[in-house]
Amino acid sequence: MTYRSKVAVVYLLGFFLDLINMFIASVAFPAMAHTFNTTPSVLAWVSNGYIAGLTLVIPFSSVLTRRIGPKRVILLSLFLFSAASAAAGLSATLESLIAWRVLQGVGGGLLIPVGQALTWQQFKPHERARLSSAVMLVALLAPACSPAIGGLLVQTLSWRWIFFATLPVAIVTFVLACLWLKHEMPAMKAARLLNLSLLADPLLRFSMLVYLCVPGVFIGVNVTGMFYLQHVANMSPAATGMLMLPWSVASFIAITATGRYFNRIGPRPLIVIGCLLQATGILLLINVSSATLLPAAAFTLMGAGGSLCSSTAQSSAFLSTRREEMPDASALWNLNRQLSFFAGALLLAQALNLAQAWLPPLAAWHGMFIFAAGMTLLPVLYVFRLNNTQVLTQLRQETS
């Protein structure tokens, strides 16, 4: 196995661990509530604590990398993650569980941007589309299997095992990082927490906008839409849960297509098609009912469009980024990724509240979906400012 493949394996394993821990806890909330005799709103901090720790430490990742080198940061992050996972499973109080989840998030928040930067440095720009496809497939697999794995562990063992179960993977990743990663001499020069000057790069700036407007908006539509589908369209909880199946299939096809066609046609057509597909899927929700196939069609279009955009954005973001700038660029990218998860749900919830203050209930929901579709189309207004021909020329020069 080549060195760059080893680096990619370590990063993808770490990325999988991060996503599993972000999504697996919620399925154990009822069992945790019974153990700690608390409410769902308080238990939400078991998930929020992880996300908070992850988000808060991301800006420090590039500075720490320059101080001690990427290998040591990755090993430190995996050690923190593993220790916090074991401690979370042994927690005797809810307060200690939340505290250990925050530390888990700190480990993940160091691992992901540093691992991504190190991995991207090993691949030339024209090779990164397929690498991005592998990353996006992990991003698709982890949320899809987390609830099933978590539910099985809670049902057969205990909620504590959702934390213990990740330990073997974390330990294997730690050992592989020890054996495979080379120690790089740290650059001791001072660095800013966030190098905002990198946003002058139009590809990075545009890719971050895409993440806010497309995956971010889908998160918001998915969160608010569950209430709409169950209480307005009269779909059962089981039926709404099954909608993620066509979404996942369409996402897989879109991610595969990006890896195949990005180097041939560039980001512009893929972004335009993706935005139009997701916007159409969102608008289809206006006319859904439990007796039609429109909900499945809507989620299929959102899965195809959203994943086409997110994988294209991932492939485009660092095309013009120099090797020495990758730690800073990766920190910005991952901070924006976390922001998109928060901002999408918050923005659409506020839009719905505002619409409900002025419109009848059904019209308010429709207005929120129209607003979400409009937000999804925002990148289309900017994509034509990108020099698609220049991107293709750069990619072809790399391959020649």
What is the predicted role of each segment?
Residues 56-95:
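Conserved MFS/SLC helix-loop-helix module at the cytosolic interface between two early adjacent transmembrane helices
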Residues 102-138:
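Cytoplasmic helix-loop-helix junction between adjacent transmembrane helices
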Residues 80-87, 95-104, 293-301:
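Paired small-residue
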